[in-house]
């Protein structure tokens, strides 16, 4: 897996608005799952990955948010 937060761009709308997650977002989130700890450690990405909407989105997609 190549860690690239740009791959998660289909998830930006739901993360920002709390809207339902499109299928493409869940697919990308599953692909990028091994990268989530790295994103959580990145100050410019943490606010998105750790937000309540992002956690709800991950839960809806069946992707557990890791404890890093």
From Swiss-Prot:
The keyword Transport applies. Keywords: Lipid-binding, Transport. GO terms for molecular function: lipid binding. One of its GO terms (biological process) is lipid transport. It holds the Pfam family Tryp_alpha_amyl. SMART domains: AAI. Belongs to the plant LTP family. Plant non-specific lipid-transfer proteins transfer phospholipids as well as galactolipids across membranes. May play a role in wax or cutin deposition in the cell walls of expanding epidermal cells and certain secretory tissues. This is Non-specific lipid-transfer protein 2. It comes from Prunus armeniaca.
